[in-house]
Design a protein with these regions (language model features):
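Residues on the lipid-exposed face of transmembrane beta-strands in outer-membrane beta-barrel proteins
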Residues: 104, 150-154, 233-237
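Outer-membrane beta-barrel domain signature, strongest for Gram-negative TonB-dependent receptors
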Residues: 170-255
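Outer-membrane beta-barrel channels and translocator barrels
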Residues: 107-109, 157-159, 240-242
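Residue-level detector of the transmembrane beta-barrel scaffold of outer-membrane proteins
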Residues: 52, 82, 112-116, 162-164, ...
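Transmembrane beta-barrel strands of outer-membrane/channel proteins
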Residues: 117-123, 165-169, 247-251
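Substrate-binding clefts and substrate-entry loops adjacent to catalytic sites
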Residues: 123-138, 142, 206-214
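Short sequence motifs at beta-strands and strand-loop junctions characteristic
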Residues: 94-96, 140-145, 223-227, 239
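Periplasmic N-terminal accessory/gating domains of Gram-negative outer-membrane beta-barrel systems
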Residues: 1-108, 127, 133-136, 149-151, ...
């Protein structure tokens, strides 16, 4: 086939061998010589890139950040068979972007039943204490992520009908506000301690509740949990030598 510009093909073996802490698709696209940070290619803003899954667009249409849709991957990296990164191709079938284009192809079932189950976990204690020989001082920000998932694929009718499913769930406990009030009015930025006294914060909270009936709730170091759930199902039907049908359903929920 005639080339329509610079392209990098990324195989399943490449995807498996690339180290990725965040399990992000953008970590894999860096295998392209033009790949930069996030979805940036050849120096262009990441929001000008185009991302497709099996030919369907999955773009950040609102455009306030360079993240993939939903603030993360629309599908699990374990559901991807191969990828291609193209840089401003002149193929008329690939349009509506001026930076790079990422084409992801999802896995499909075969005549052999295959499956996997996995758990990934990371937290702030897995980080080192030194950067370029300098010790990192201060309180360590909470950075935890636990991911559970599975894949399963195989034949429904041998040589004719196949299925593949993938489900993944991630939990990310965070802290909405790390700053705390001080006891003596002395601030300590490294420990996230404000110069505002705890007793003053308590007085303000009590005043607002008595005057307006409004409960301020906690004003210091209170937690929140983010979650991400992905599900993908695909069915492939070999109708005959000239006709094939593929149906794919995917669902993503961020909270």
């Amino acid at each position: 086939a005639q080339k329509m510009g610079s392209a990098t093909n990324i195989s399943s073996a490449d995807i498996i061998s690339v180290p990725t802490v965040s399990r992000s698709i953008s970590d894999v696209t860096r295998l392209s010589p033009y790949g930069g940070n996030g979805m940036s290619f050849a120096g262009a803003d990441g929001r000008t890139a185009n991302f497709t899954v099996d030919g369907a667009n999955f773009n950040n249409n609102f455009g306030l950040s360079d993240n993939l849709p939903g603030g993360g991957n629309p599908i699990s990296i374990d559901a991807i068979e191969e990828m291609q990164v193209v840089i401003s191709p002149y193929d008329v079938r690939q349009t509506n972007f001026i930076g790079g284009g990422v084409n992801a192809i999802t896995k499909s079932g075969t005549n052999t039943f295959k499956g996997s189950a996995y758990v990934y976990h990371r937290n702030e204690n897995m980080r080192g204490n030194f950067v370029a020989g300098q010790e990192v001082a201060g309180a360590r920000d909470k950075d935890r992520n636990t991911t559970y998932g599975f894949t399963l694929g195989g034949p429904i009718v041998k040589d004719k009908l196949f299925f593949f499913v993938n489900a993944e769930y991630s939990t990310i406990p965070t802290v909405v506000n790390r700053w705390r009030g001080s006891v003596d009015g002395e601030a300590n930025a490294d420990a996230y301690i404000s110069r505002t006294k705890l007793e003053d914060l308590q007085k303000v909270s009590e005043f607002v509740k008595e005057k307006y009936g409004y409960d301020t709730g906690s004003w210091t170091d209170y937690p929140a949990t983010e979650s991400n759930m992905k599900f993908l199902a695909r069915i492939d039907w070999n109708i005959n030598d000239n006709h094939k049908l593929a149906l794919r359903y995917n669902y993503t929920l961020n909270q």
